[in-house]
Amino acid sequence: MGATKSKPREGGPRSRSLDIAEGSHQPFTSLSASQTPSKSLDSHRPSGQPFGGNCDLTPFGGVNFSDTITSPQRTGPLAGGVTTFVALYDYESRTETDLSFRKGERLQIVNNTEGDWWLARSLSSGQTGYIPSNYVAPSDSIQAEEWYLGKITRREAERLLLSLENPRGTFLVRESETTKGAYCLSVSDYDASRGLNVKHYKIRKLDSGGFYITSRTQFSSLQQLVAYYSKHADGLCHRLTAVCPTAKPQTQGLSKDAWEIPRDSLRLELKLGQGCFGEVWMGTWNGTTRVAIKTLKPGTMSPEAFLQEAQVMKKLRHEKLVQLYAVVSEEPIYIVTEYMSKGSLLDFLKGEMGRYLRLPQLVDMAAQIASGMAYVERMNYVHRDLRAANILVGENLVCKVADFGLARLIEDNEYTARQGAKFPIKWTAPEAALYGRFTIKSDVWSFGILLTELTTKGRVPYPGMVNREVLDQVERGYRMPCPPDCPESLHDLMFQCWRKDPEERPTFEYLQAFLEDYFTATEPQYQPGDNL
């Protein structure tokens, strides 16, 4: 089907089938030849105005946002004069200037100076319009292969492959995290002792340009390697049976130039939550695109200050941060973000699904949050209100950090007094609660409290204690005891987050690495290829 400027429809996740050309599977037989995280320098933005907010609901309600696993960004600036790209997904236009296209369609890039949205012409229909740059890849490149997911982590690969719907032998190819220029083949497996698990095989490059997992079987391209192992296990845990499914990625923004948008372009459809400072709605932008909309009560924050902060927030882009799409900057302020289907982590933990979560899932969710916060740390930003109510959950237990930075702008007296009823004392580091010193290290303290929310399935921290009592006791050195059924190693991690001296608390980089490796510290990084 050719490209059109038709009325968009919501598209679902793409399903992937193994489609390998005949004759491409023959190898050629030439026979030529736990990471310790570094402690980053923590810097922070000026603490600015004190914040707070301690109602049962998050300041913006217990919300719901995007329900997709973000597919990795697989395209970049055009190199070597390449202007012909292939579509990785279907895309339906959202505005009159967008171009609809179908997966597999070939597109000529007219102008790629527009950042996230490129002007392109369909080679099948001849029509021209803007396309999301992360929905296409250079024709005939490795990035255009369905099974190639680029720069995703080992843990993210396992998260995708361990879906119960995947048959044994489901696979993907990604960049190696440990060896520059090498790749990794990740394959789902099953055995009676371990149940579902994932095996990782390093794909090495030959000086001559070929590829191999074991030196006795070599290939001229990754496509040949995948085709061969789809027919022969030849020492792998299983032959390759199906490409790992992923969902469409979020576009970077709603469309080209859609940032400050008119209020009447939004339709509020279903109220999802209500908090101290506003409401959260599921809605539609421009009649085409599902979004979440936060409506702030007039007087909650200065529109000018919000717009200035939002310009910074929209530049924060990470697969574990809820994406800020657009704003209505006149009061009542609207904040438009990606929509996630499972609501806030707090509601999720306390709800029906919470009872089925076991330690591996809880640790994985914590690792995802730490990953998003490690990015915030690298960007020298501060969240200021990190807790389960401000984490959002999508399909497949995907977690994303929301509401970063907004707390600094709130002007409500009960929020800014730091002792008021709306201030989240129980999550706040003592130096922030007492003196307004909000840094990435006070976020680390809050993360330790969030870990107790995870391990207790949403219990309020410091049970039986009121805010004033918590502040007094913490100042005297009190720390929460180990929650029931929580491993001592996790409780020790919480204690590290609650050290009195902020500089002695771990970095989010360290927390991410610790949690991602929590169950894999004794496993080899890769299966031994030359023993196949």
From Swiss-Prot:
The keyword Kinase applies. Residues 1-56 are annotated as: Disordered. ATP binds at L272, G273, Q274, G275, C276, F277, G278, E279, V280, K294. Its main location: membrane. It is an enzyme of class 2 (transferase). GO terms for molecular function: ATP binding; non-membrane spanning protein tyrosine kinase activity; signaling receptor binding. A lipid is attached at G2 (N-myristoyl glycine). Residues 7-19 have a biased composition (Basic and acidic residues). Residues 26-40 have a biased composition (Polar residues). One of its GO terms (biological process) is epidermal growth factor receptor signaling pathway. Keywords: ATP-binding, Cell membrane, Kinase, Lipoprotein, Membrane, Myristate, Nucleotide-binding, Phosphoprotein, SH2 domain, SH3 domain, Transferase, Tyrosine-protein kinase. This is Tyrosine-protein kinase Src-2.
